Amino acid sequence: MEPVRSYVICCVQRTGSWLLAHTLADTGYAGRPSDYFDDAEREDHAREWGVPAGDLTAYVRAVWDKATTPNGVLGSKLMWNDFDWLRSSLRPPAGTDAGLAFMRMAFPDAQFVWLRRQDKVRQGISWWRAAVTGQWGLRPGQQAGRPPPEVEQMVQLVRFAEQCEDGWRQWFAATGIQPCEVLYEDLATDRLTVVNAVLEFLRLPHLDADDLPPVRYRQQADA
């Protein structure tokens, strides 16, 4: 299905992107945002969808079919490290921003939601724990792993998170794009208000409190 318009949740790992993406997807009319362009996810999806390996154009078309709701809205998540790789793999005409060329090719009439987290220390700890335990999301009732802390690796991820956020900031400034800015801290404490602000930005209907989809994954209490 070819989308009429689209949006991208531009983010870094452990910023609440699944919470925002699942809530938007569960409305039934705000696309089906997911990590379609994560390196491992991309390989798995390409195999599942029968898309030739390395054919980015064919893969994008397959994403359109999976991520577009019947009203023609396409939604996707995009981490900075995946975006950085994608834009480096393109060879646009001279003077054309490679990242913007990819966005225009993959996301028709795109709008951008910039999701970030103020507390970088907690972000780094959460990222490290998820990477070590493989628990990127906790279902209700699921116990979180508690591996022995490795401070040096946590610090490295805090710094990498800062670099990735700066990457998005600089790219938005360079391209003149003005995204809808969302903070994880606000999303975690007042999901309805934040999601409705995003829906308004996307020119989509608001949610009533009774229609707010349940949370699929619970928050890790200390990260």
Where are these regions (language model features)?
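PAPS-dependent sulfotransferase catalytic core
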Residues: 1-72, 217-219
